[in-house]
Amino acid sequence: MEGITEAVNNLNISDTHKRNRIQVSNTKKPLFFYVNLAKRYMQQYNEVELSALGMAIATVVTVAEILKNNGFAVEKKIRTLTVDVRNEPEGRPLPKAKIEILLGKTQNFDELMAAEAEAREYGDSEQQS
């Protein structure tokens, strides 16, 4: 029990970022899945970290730009790096480009989300009539 308490007490800021990180793929989910997921993460954590490797970098940049251009997010930090990825356990490591984009909520984020929810409700009630 003491080990768990010690681990919790020693949590650093990078550990808390793991909870609000979205690893974006350019093949697994549609673009707006990530846009909507990022909005939910920002509601919950006030910021979201989008990360991608290789070909998915264009997708993560597009997601960030959609959120910024629609007034939901502001850019806090962008980090680029190269990571070694192995396709096979004994294979050679291959360098892959990686990007991490940290986005924070804008001041009017909550108003925009409320307006979006209201528009969705209005659209649902119109379809039912």
Describe the residue ranges of each PLM region.
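Long, charged, low-complexity intrinsically disordered regions
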Residues: 1-45, 58-129
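Short glycine-rich phosphate-binding loop at a beta-alpha junction
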Residues: 48-52
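Short, internal active-site loops enriched in acidic
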Residues: 54-56
